[in-house]
Every structure is written in structure tokens, then in C-alpha cells.
């Protein structure tokens, strides 16, 4: 028979257990909540929607936004408003592109659909992930963008999506979300659990494209870490963020960084070494009822460098985000569906 325990010892053990069970989440740090319902709206030009991705140039000017008619627009302040910065070769040639109406999903491939955007600050070049036309680039003066690549390893791009630039090397990391389904069939990627996506690298020196990782489930947004040692990739399905190690003992490894509370779109570095992840939709609980439905609508989360959630963004029901870009302490909000760009000062 074992030693008889003192009642005081039992009481202490119960207190410790209670603290572990009920106070555990607090130990990880309080998650800050930012409500975006009071954000300032910058309306897009009439007939234009879907500022899917946002970028700022090396001077901090912008944002620049890829929109529904195939153009990249630049915000010049409240006096200037939005002006055309870049477009594909077809934009000036096809009347549909300049008709002033939102192209349908069936016809947007003719005009192009810019998604991921990022500048290389040293050269001033803007790199564009066009869903249909491929990886593109335009110089600091804007104008007609040139196509840099339309495929890799003999496989054509089918749905070019997220993009980021290593500012030290000029190399571009981007995703081809599916080699089976184009953008207008993006729901089929999820419904059929398609896992034919790829993470790719455009070498700025050799001007070649390499496949870093294949057979991925809906890879979307991309962000190079602040130290350039890894690339974070948001997977719309299965609502996760992974990281690919570029150098060191773990070079080439692909590992889970975070499980996410919704379906992610773009991922961006924040100003503290972490990441902002835009959520196009929250996860749906199969057992959800009106009584158990969440009282807040998540549209984005902030992760630290280790993948721990430290902040969440909320919005009114029905609002979805595709991008959260931080610039000089302000949050700029892009959406693939809305008719404006949001600003949280």
C-alpha cells in the first residue's frame, strides 16, 4: 500500500489542475481583436471590383491593386484617386476589356486577371501573378506588362495565384494553385480535393522557373520570411499555412506552420517578423446552429514567426477579405468581391 497523502497536498493538486484546464489559453497570450467595420473605404472606379491583392512600391506609394478588368491600378491619394498603372497586351486591343463593366468569369481570361502583386524595391519592377496569362513584370513607369513565364517543367501554368519577392536576391516565389482547374473553376478545386498545385521560384539571374514543391492542395498566398530563410504558403484547403525552408539544414523541407480558422487567401509579412493571413471565409462547423454560431465574423488573422495566432480581424457578416497589407502602421484591406479597398488607420 502506498504512502497516505496529506489533504492539503490533494487541494493543491486540484488547484493546479483547475488552472491548467481553465486558464490554459491565457498562458499563450491574449489574442487582440481589431474590428474592421469602421475602416475607411477607397471606392474603386465605376464598374470595377475585386482588389484581390495590394502592393506598395519602394517609395511607399500606393497601394497598387489588381482588379477585375485586368488592370493594375494605383492609388494617388484623395485628390488623384485611382489611375491605370499596368495592363496586359490584350487590354488595349479587346473592346471588352475597356467596356467599363465587370468581365464574367468566362471572359476575364481574355483581359487577364492580376492576383498576387509585389514590387522589387531595388529595381522598381512590379511582379504580377496573372491567373490566366502567367508570371508577368512591368517596370517602375508602368504600362504594358511583359510575360516572363507560362509554365514549368513542361507543364503549363493553369491558375497562377500568390506571389512574393525576395528583396535581397530579386527571386520571385509564386503558386500555381491547380494544374487541373483554372481560376473560374476554383470551387471544383475544393470540392474534388484537387492536389495538383505547385510552389515555384523564378530565378531573377537565370530567368528560369523551378518547381520547389508539387502535388499541393490549393496553394494560394505566398510570403518570404523577413530573414529570407523560408517561404510561407497559405493553403485555401485544408485551411492551413505551411513553410518551405530555402536554406540551412532543413532546406527543401515543407512543414505545417499553422492551422487556420478559415479559408486563407493571401499571406503578407507584418512589420514584426510575422504574417497577416486574409480569410475569404470562416470554417463551417457541421454541428453549428443559430445558438452556437460565432458572434463575430473573422476575416483575417495575424501569426507570429512561429505560427501562433496573436491577432484577429473581424468584419460585418458578408464581408470577405483576400489581402491584408501593412504599411507604416496602417492596414490596407483587399477583397476579391468588394468595390473598394479598406483602410484601418
Model-derived features: positions:
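Sequence-structural signature of mature extracellular/luminal beta-sheet repeat domains
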Residues: 2-345
Amino acid at each position: 500500500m502506498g504512502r497516505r497523502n496529506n489533504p492539503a497536498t490533494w487541494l493543491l493538486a486540484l488547484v493546479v489542475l483547475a488552472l491548467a484546464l481553465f486558464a490554459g489559453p491565457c498562458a499563450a497570450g491574449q489574442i487582440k481583436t481589431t474590428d474592421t467595420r469602421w475602416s475607411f473605404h477607397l471606392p474603386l472606379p465605376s464598374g470595377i471590383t475585386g482588389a484581390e491583392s495590394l502592393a506598395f512600391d519602394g517609395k511607399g506609394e500606393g497601394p497598387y491593386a489588381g482588379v477585375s478588368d485586368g488592370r493594375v491600378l494605383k492609388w494617388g491619394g484623395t485628390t488623384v484617386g485611382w489611375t491605370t498603372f499596368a495592363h496586359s497586351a490584350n487590354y488595349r486591343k479587346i473592346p471588352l476589356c475597356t467596356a467599363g463593366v465587370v468581365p464574367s468569369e468566362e471572359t476575364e481570361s481574355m483581359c487577364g486577371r492580376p492576383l498576387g502583386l509585389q514590387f522589387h524595391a531595388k529595381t522598381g519592377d512590379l511582379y504580377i501573378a496573372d491567373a490566366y496569362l502567367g508570371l508577368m513584370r512591368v517596370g517602375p513607369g508602368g504600362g504594358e506588362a511583359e510575360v516572363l513565364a507560362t509554365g514549368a517543367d513542361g507543364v503549363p501554368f493553369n491558375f497562377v495565384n500568390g506571389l512574393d519577392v525576395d528583396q535581397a536576391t530579386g527571386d520571385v516565389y509564386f503558386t500555381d494553385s491547380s494544374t487541373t482547374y483554372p481560376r473560374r473553376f476554383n470551387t471544383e478545386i475544393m470540392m474534388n480535393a484537387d492536389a495538383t498545385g505547385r510552389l515555384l521560384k523564378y530565378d531573377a539571374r537565370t530567368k528560369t522557373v523551378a518547381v520547389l514543391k508539387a502535388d499541393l492542395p490549393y496553394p494560394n498566398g505566398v510570403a518570404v520570411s523577413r530573414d529570407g530563410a523560408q517561404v510561407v504558403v497559405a493553403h485555401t484547403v485544408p485551411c492551413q499555412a505551411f513553410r518551405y525552408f530555402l536554406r540551412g539544414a532543413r532546406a527543401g523541407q515543407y512543414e505545417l506552420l499553422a492551422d487556420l480558422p478559415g479559408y486563407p487567401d493571401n499571406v503578407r509579412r507584418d512589420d514584426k517578423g510575422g504574417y497577416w493571413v486574409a480569410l475569404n471565409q470562416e470554417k463551417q462547423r457541421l454541428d453549428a446552429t443559430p445558438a452556437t454560431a460565432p458572434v463575430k465574423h473573422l476575416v483575417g488573422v495575424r501569426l507570429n514567426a512561429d505560427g501562433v495566432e496573436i491577432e484577429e480581424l473581424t468584419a460585418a457578416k458578408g464581408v470577405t477579405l483576400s489581402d491584408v497589407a501593412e504599411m507604416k502602421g496602417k492596414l490596407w484591406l483587399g477583397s476579391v468581391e468588394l468595390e473598394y479597398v479598406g483602410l484601418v488607420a
